[in-house]
Amino acid sequence: MDNLNFILPEIFISLSIMFLLLLGVYKKNSSNIVHNLAVGSLLITGILIFNNPLDQNISLFNDGYVVDNLSSFMKILTILGGAFVLSISTRYLKIFKIFLIEYPVLILSSILGMMVMISSNDLMVFYIGLELQSLALYVLASFNRDQLKSSESGLKYFVLSALSSGLLLYGCSLVYGFSGSTNFNVIGDLMNSSHYGLTFGIVFILVGLAFKISAVPFHMWAPDVYEGSPTAVTLFFAIVPKVAALTVFIRFLYIPFVNMIDQWQPILIFLSIASMIFGAIAAIGQNNLKRLIAYSSIGHMGYALAGLSTGSNEGIQSSIVYMSIYLVMNLAFFSCLLMLKRNDAYYETIDDLSGLSKNHPILSLSLLAILFSLAGIPPLAGFFAKFYIFKAVIEQSMYFLAIVGLLSTVIAAFYYLKIIKVIYFDKEKESYDTDHNIWLKGSLTFSTLLILLYFIFPSKLLEIVSRINII
């Protein structure tokens, strides 16, 4: 029974999913209730995670499931991201007539899958979590089934994700075949010498994981899926699954295969460099803001992978800090995007921001701070996120990676500054509606303040993350 206390968050969210589904089926017009209860369920799940003792490494189910500082922190990030997504998307879903009970249930299901992934210490447990997350995301991508683009994006994501899952499963089978176990700790104890079969297994698993975070060259799904999916779903895609996938990267590489760093480090460096360069260059020609943020997120994942490729605790911690700040920046950006509404129609191109500062000065100021932060301009939070990554990379004498990262940051700054130029210097268009959901306004205010004021108290986040020691 003591063990069950450590998985109470997962048990509670599982029961919540079943209860909300039954409530939605048996009670007519219950979308509002189910939606609000889903947000409440996530907040209670977060409280249950906080109740778990800190600085303890608890292993459950024959070491297949772990509860430690890394899992607790990343689960909190995932749950906060999910709660904000549900809170700010209600008006959008109602306008498109997709305010259904299935939406919060699918969000909760994918978050449950992510929580299992984050705590997994076994290839089988990890794969079960991954598939639970993916099955919910396939449906979410095509949730607005009356729109051709949404159905198309769901189908594209399903086909390509199924391919990546197949490669990942093949990699798992190779690792199991050559090590004789699926448990990360057992595999780590056996890994005194490298074997070509194991190296191939690692490569296949890394390919599958790279697809999940849309790292180059496995990014091809991201722009189309981001653009075609409903904006509320795109927001979820952009932030939450990547937190879980990055945690799996950390566990998979630094627990069973830390002794094989010579084999996987070059792969991670390649993924990082390719993602940073491609993400910076490909976004330049984009006019649709959702496609632009897709390419931007590819670049951001490159920076996160740069931290992981260092092979040091500092590198891992810098990547975790980067993902935390990335989540806040994207939440703020999409909050602004959901405010671009006029007569029940949403606008999502750069041209639609033309002269926004004349009619909506406060919204424009928020966008200014968010875009400067995404570009990595001091003293905003995005600058510190990149600073920690570059510091960790340079400490390991990986100068080429740091130079590529800096050059990519300069190139990426161009398209962020181009949007600011459109907002402040182009001719204004008809003003947008101002009667927004209080949660949407609160989300934008909260996330923008975090971006602006992070430099005053950066030590708090660093102090929490410094407790996460993997190596």
Swiss-Prot record:
PANTHER family in UniProt: NADH DEHYDROGENASE
GO molecular function, one term: NADH:ubiquinone reductase (non-electrogenic) activity
EC number: 7.1.1.-
Protein name: NADH-quinone oxidoreductase subunit N
Record has Transport as a keyword: yes
Known function: NDH-1 shuttles electrons from NADH, via FMN and iron-sulfur (Fe-S) centers, to quinones in the respiratory chain. The immediate electron acceptor for the enzyme in this species is believed to be ubiquinone. Couples the redox reaction to proton translocation (for every two electrons transferred, four hydrogen ions are translocated across the cytoplasmic membrane), and thus conserves the redox energy in a proton gradient.
Reaction equations catalysed: a quinone + NADH + 5 H(+)(in) = a quinol + NAD(+) + 4 H(+)(out)
Organism: Pelagibacter ubique (strain HTCC1062)
Secretion signal, residue range per the UniProt entry: none
HAMAP family to which the protein is assigned, alphabetical: NDH1_NuoN_1
Sequence similarity: Belongs to the complex I subunit 2 family.
